[in-house]
A protein has these predicted regions:
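Extended, low-hydrophobicity, polar/charged segments
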Residues: 2-160
Length: 160
């Protein structure tokens, strides 16, 4: 039912840092912000969703708070291109994880990762670990380190 290969990539990624025991797997789907929040028992905003945008032949990943939305104007100012998300059928081959499990851990080479300021409201956040039923709780310093992020950016808007 769940994609086993990708969670293994995610687990192996954290194993090298001695953090594999912090990876959580669920008997239920955590493929959307709402489902992940339910599985973890936390507010949806604390789910660090990973958004994948086309860039030439590859993509960039932006981690944002669960309640944040991409602000097209801010995105274009930052990246000098329109925000065009990868098609679902492109995600696995380009990023290395399936839709619902996309995260910056154990991804294909050559992908730039950015963290959106919307996450900074929280001490810890919960990104996926490569499958549609996984997560790991990380503080912001850990998220920055283990995602190999280039920088914190401001390309989202929060609900009014």
């Amino acid at each position: 039912r769940w994609s086993g290969m990708s969670i293994e990539k995610g687990r192996a990624y954290f194993r090298q840092f001695g953090m594999e025991d912090r990876v959580r797997e669920f008997d239920v789907s955590s493929a959307t912000v709402e489902l992940a929040a339910l599985a973890l028992g936390v507010e949806g905003a604390r789910i660090a969703k990973t958004l994948s945008f086309k860039k030439d032949d590859s993509c960039i990943l932006i981690l944002a708070a669960g309640d944040a939305r991409i602000d097209n104007h801010k995105f274009k100012d930052k990246f000098h291109m329109k925000a065009k998300m990868l098609a679902p059928e492109e995600v696995l081959s380009i990023v290395g994880h399936p839709v619902g499990g996309v995260c910056p851990f154990g991804i294909n080479d050559g992908i730039d990762v950015y963290l959106d300021e919307s996450l900074k409201r929280f001490e810890t956040v919960f990104p996926a670990v490569g499958s549609a039923n996984s997560a790991i709780e990380l503080d912001l310093d850990e998220l920055y380190k283990y995602s190999n992020a280039i920088e914190w950016i401001d390309v989202c808007k929060l609900p009014e």
